[in-house]
Amino acid sequence: MSLLLENLIEEDTIFFAGSISEYDDLQMVIAGAKSKFPRSMLSIFNIVPRTMSKYELELIHNENITGAMFTTMYNIRNNLGLGDDKLTIEAIENYFLDPNNEVMPLIINNTDMTAVIPKKSGRRKNKNMVIFRQGSSPILCIFETRKKINIYKENMESASTEYTPIGDNKALISKYAGINILNVYSPSTSIRLNAIYGFTNKNKLEKLSTNKELESYSSSPLQEPIRLNDFLGLLECVKKNIPLTDIPTKD
């Protein structure tokens, strides 16, 4: 199993939110397969944000964006190559806002994770899969744009035979197997880290405002795993208490 996912999910916990039913869909995955983006919980759903599109982009909003990203402290520490070094708020911010990252996928208010369908397993099928393992230290990061940014959608009636770069300093609402994700391009110049939250063993959130609080949280990992049903409840709690951007979309 990939080290990237080791502390995120159980061995059998695999979700697939990128089901490829047509060759055109395969091309769309290929169009973003080499993009550089910070890995997060969305990676376990096989969500690969695209940096190219074969559709015309339509401007739908110009506004400030607030979005969320779930991951674990192990994931960030491992990807930064920190080893046993302490993880700091500055390191977390540098990881997500590395200038090499071309795009950052964000969960927004109308991101519906109930659309996730567990991938069938030859051994068993558990609809209430583990999202964060016992012993892990998951965190919720809240990001906001530094200023108003143009938000686009793809005009699905304007397909071209060629892919073109989506471009920098813009956001694109995209759907991955029914899950709405807001992709922000050139995130290092357009967004900033606003807040970090940890998960208590009662499946509640606590704000981590200092490196001392972050270190204390990392020394008290989850005593029980967070399964899909609990995670969906946490996500709804986040939406009720944090004003995430809402971008209505038509199916």
UniProtKB/Swiss-Prot annotation:
Expression triggers: Expressed in the intermediate phase of the viral replicative cycle.
Transmembrane regions: none
Post-translational modification, as annotated: Undergoes morphogenesis-associated proteolysis which cleaves the 28 kDa to a 25-kDa product. Proteolytic cleavage of major core proteins P4a (OPG136/A10L), P4b (OPG129/A3L), and VP8 (OPG098/L4R), which occurs at a late stage of core formation, is required for production of infectious mature virions (MV).
Disulfide topology: none
InterPro entries associated with the record: VP8_pox_nuc-bd
Any GO MF annotation of the entry: structural molecule activity
Coiled coil: none
Site (Cleavage): 18-19, 32-33
Subcellular locations according to the entry: Virion; Host cytoplasm
Keywords for the protein's UniProt record, in alphabetical order: Host cytoplasm, Virion
Cellular component GO terms held in the UniProt record: host cell cytoplasm; viral capsid
Positions of the pro-segment in this chain: 1-32
Family membership: Belongs to the orthopoxvirus OPG098 family.
Function: Major core structural protein.
The name this protein goes by in its record: Core protein VP8
